[in-house]
Amino acid sequence: MSNILILDFGSQYTNVLAKKIRLLSVFCEVLPWNTPLEKILQKSPSGLIFSGGPHSVYQNNSPEVDKEIYNSNIPILGVCYGMQLIARDFGSEVQGGKSEFGYTPIVFYPSELFKGLADQDAFHTEIRMSHCDCVVVPPKDFFVIASSQHCPIAAIECPKKKLFGLQFHPEVSDSQDIGDKILSNFVKHICQTSETWKIETIEKQLIQGIREKVGETERVLLGLSGGVDSSVLAVLLHNALGDRLSCVFVDTGLLRKNEVEEVKQQFSSLGLEILVVDASEKFFHDLSGIEDPEQKRKVIGAAFIEVFDEASKNLDVQWLAQGTIYSDVIESAKSCDATQVIKSHHNVGGLPEKLNLKLLEPLRFLFKDEVRALGKVLGLPDVLISRHPFPGPGLGVRVLGEVRREYVEIVKNADSIFIEELKKANLYHKVSQAFAVFLPCKSVAVKGDCRHYGYTIALRAVESTDFMTACWPSLSREFLNRCSSRIINEIPEVCRVVYDISDKPPATIEWE
């Protein structure tokens, strides 16, 4: 099967790049930059990409690759730091102080990499630059194929070795049309890949992989959340294992309004029997007094495991299945030691060392949009597939600070009002995710001519294609006013509503 490997040097866009390549129907995997050459070659990659990163190639102990990789006859594309690394490894000098940020005029020259952009003549356009270092002179046998005013060597190629370098990021949305064309040229034409990464193929591979891993007699326990990921996984596992799957839905007390009944009805219609366990007392007890977001996630993850472990004693199961997806792994920073931890995912960072069940994560290398596409192939109803993402820790990370029952009830009702109004205004499917956040601080208000102290609710909505980056939508004043009025009037404890206008980055989508 055709495949592209990305060696990750710590760029915040590495996984966006991987998703872009998969959209070309070619499998792409992200590996740490220091992956041994032998392991890389064992995967028989059709092409390699060196990602960007926060380092400078002239610094001591900067990340580098085994130089034998250049003799492998595998096409290589270096992006930003990756280009500078290739240039340095072939004898060129890289210097700092030549920074460019934002939209920059650039000229593309004829190259196989720019097929369809600069076939005969130079192509003038603008591209988004974000770099502090520049290649001073092209290495021997390399040609300059793009230039900007402050970066004369903005792209390079060595046709003989099929080595290419870009000083800019083709994967960022600002450069989408041009960037997509460049990536397509590299992946499809230079690497000569075939379109083998398709949802129908993925479904068959996942089912086969599940059966091989679990064997013919062992059983699997799945913790349902009611979200897209666990719902898709439930049907996938049922198709693979039949009645050897046991589904447990844990009522943590941290779920959305009416979620327990909705989940029972949805899965009953899919022919899946589920066991509902009310563990809300345990979760609130374990979270008592804990304010740190990271600690809350770990406590919630540990509590899930304890509940599942107890349930498994009566179900004769050997495996615990989780709906971990690629973005969960990414945000927990397990793909590259040059990346800093943003937040632990409860499925990833919160697992205790001693796990009495073997872990099964079939969706671990799928992005959210791929999970949704898989759900359609599996026949899940749109109401499940198109539902907004909900964090594994639930409302536990939408109550800032200590999690208390009364706080959860407040944010649960506020969230329900917000979602209801979005659906009424036909906005629910126009935003990628929306929810309410409880702020445990009181402010002064006036209700019924009396002085009143009440809590604050923050409303959060984002638009995103991959949830690695996101922007806030400009919801109308009239719409926000309706939401605010209902929340303040229908929830006595609330006296103030604010709307979050923070993009990701720098903010994350969830507040905790």
Curated annotation (Swiss-Prot):
Positions of ATP binding: S225, G226, G227, V228, D229, S230, S231
InterPro entries: Class_I_gatase-like (IPR029062), GATASE (IPR017926), GMP_synth_C (IPR001674), GMP_synth_GATase (IPR004739), GMP_synthase (IPR022955), GMPS_ATP_PPase_dom (IPR025777), NAD/GMP_synthase (IPR022310), Rossmann-like_a/b/a_fold (IPR014729)
Domain Glutamine amidotransferase type-1: 3-196
Class of this enzyme: ligase
Catalytic activity, as annotated: XMP + L-glutamine + ATP + H2O = GMP + L-glutamate + AMP + diphosphate + 2 H(+)
Keyword set, alphabetical order: ATP-binding, Glutamine amidotransferase, GMP biosynthesis, Ligase, Nucleotide-binding, Purine biosynthesis
Top-level taxon in the UniProt lineage: Bacteria
Active site residues according to the UniProt entry: C80 (nucleophile), H169, E171
SUPFAM superfamilies: Adenine nucleotide alpha hydrolases-like, Class I glutamine amidotransferase-like, GMP synthetase C-terminal dimerisation domain
EC number: 6.3.5.2
One Gene Ontology term, aspect cellular component: cytosol
GMPS ATP-PPase domain: residues covered: 197-387
CDD domains, per database record: GATase1_GMP_Synthase (cd01742), GMP_synthase_C (cd01997)
Annotated GO MF terms: ATP binding; GMP synthase activity
Record pathway: Purine metabolism; GMP biosynthesis; GMP from XMP (L-Gln route): step 1/1
Record function comment: Catalyzes the synthesis of GMP from XMP.
NCBIfam families hit by this protein: guaA_Cterm, guaA_Nterm, PRK00074.1
PANTHER family recorded: GMP SYNTHASE [GLUTAMINE-HYDROLYZING], GMP SYNTHASE-RELATED
Subunit composition and interactions: Homodimer.
Protein name: GMP synthase [glutamine-hydrolyzing]
Organism phylogeny: Bacteria, Pseudomonadati, Chlamydiota, Chlamydiia, Chlamydiales
